[in-house]
Amino acid sequence: MQTSDLLRHQLIKSLTTQRPEKGTDAAVDLWTQMAAQLILIIGAGGFDSLYARSVFLSQSTHPWLAARSGPPQTDHRFADLKKSLQAQSPTLARDANCLLLITFTNILASMIGEHLTSRILGSAWDIDTQDTADKEINSA
């Protein structure tokens, strides 16, 4: 299956284009919701490692994406991301956030599987992904 055909990617693209009036706040909300779910499972250190790797990989396309300037603080975990996105045009910021989310979830899915990744994202973003995950498995 082509990577661009993954329903998870389509979901991320859809979510990153919603609420354009909220701008970077909407982008950070997606990350905050996902982090809350994943940290319960893999811990803050595990999440931070995956996030740092995703930023590093995404910097080849968007070199202005900032890596964390220090140890993450729970209440400001995505402050550097927000600053990076705010410094760009809304379209470029949206595209970069979409790539970063896709990169992050690709890494996660390679570790825990597509089905579990979809379930976690569905829980984080309050979306029923059961049908989505079943379609992914059946078409693989």
Where are these regions (language model features)?
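Long, compositionally biased intrinsically disordered regulatory segments in eukaryotic proteins
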Residues: 1-140
